[in-house]
C-alpha cells in the first residue's frame, strides 16, 4: 500500500488536505479531500498539475498532468488528462469534503503523481465541454487560490 498527501495552501484563505492511497499499480487510487475557505455552495476545479513547484505561487505548478497527451475532460471521460479530477462541491460554509477512486491516477509506476501538485481553482471546471480552445486545455477553471505538492507518507 502506497500513501501520499498534499497540503494545500495559498494566498486567498483557501487551504486543505488531499490524501491518496493505492494498493498496487493495477489498482485504482483512492483520493480523499477536505478543502476550506472556498465560496459557499460552489463547484471548484480540482486538478493534478505537472510540476511540484510553488516558487511563484500555484502558477509554477504548470499545466495539468497529461502524460498521454490527451485533451481536457471529466474524470469519467475516456479522453482526459490524468490530472483531471473534475470539480469539488462546497457546502454552506465553503468546505469541500469527499472521496473517489480513479484508475488513471497512480502513485506507483511511470505515470506516478508523486512530486506533482494538486491545485484547487477559483472557478468551476467546464470539463472540456466549453466552446473555446482553452476548455480543452484547462476547463476554464480560472485562478489558482491554493496548491500543494504530493508527497509520500508512511
UniProtKB/Swiss-Prot annotation:
Binding positions (substrate): 144
Residues annotated as binding Cu cation: 47, 49, 64, 121
Single GO MF descriptor: copper ion binding
Cofactor list: Cu cation; Zn(2+)
Covalent link (Glycyl lysine isopeptide (Lys-Gly) (interchain with G-Cter in SUMO)) residue numbers: 19, 70
Disulfide bonds: 58-147
Protein residues bound to Zn(2+) 2: 43
Modified-residue entries (Phosphothreonine), positions: 132, 138
Keyword annotations from UniProtKB, A to Z: Antioxidant, Copper, Cytoplasm, Disulfide bond, Isopeptide bond, Metal-binding, Mitochondrion, Oxidoreductase, Phosphoprotein, Ubl conjugation, Zinc
Modified residue annotations for Phosphoserine: 26, 39, 99, 117
Miscellaneous comment text of the record: Present with 519000 molecules/cell in log phase SD medium.
Family membership: Belongs to the Cu-Zn superoxide dismutase family.
PANTHER family the UniProt entry points to: SUPEROXIDE DISMUTASE CU-ZN -RELATED
Protein name: Superoxide dismutase [Cu-Zn]
Amino acid at each position: 500500500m502506497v500513501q501520499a498527501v498534499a497540503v494545500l495552501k495559498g494566498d486567498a484563505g483557501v487551504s486543505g488536505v488531499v490524501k491518496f492511497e493505492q494498493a498496487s499499480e493495477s489498482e485504482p487510487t483512492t483520493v480523499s479531500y477536505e478543502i476550506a475557505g472556498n465560496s459557499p455552495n460552489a463547484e471548484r476545479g480540482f486538478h493534478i498539475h505537472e510540476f511540484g513547484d510553488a516558487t511563484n505561487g500555484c502558477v509554477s505548478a504548470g499545466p495539468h498532468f497529461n502524460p498521454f497527451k490527451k485533451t481536457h475532460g471529466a474524470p469519467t471521460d475516456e479522453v482526459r488528462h490524468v490530472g483531471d479530477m473534475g470539480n469539488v462541491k462546497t457546502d454552506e460554509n465553503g468546505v469541500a469534503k469527499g472521496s473517489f477512486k480513479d484508475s488513471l491516477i497512480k502513485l506507483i509506476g511511470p505515470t506516478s503523481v508523486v512530486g506533482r501538485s494538486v491545485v484547487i481553482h477559483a472557478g468551476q471546471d467546464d470539463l472540456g465541454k466549453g466552446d473555446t480552445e482553452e476548455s480543452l486545455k484547462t476547463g476554464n477553471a480560472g485562478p489558482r487560490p491554493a496548491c500543494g505538492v504530493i508527497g509520500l507518507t508512511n
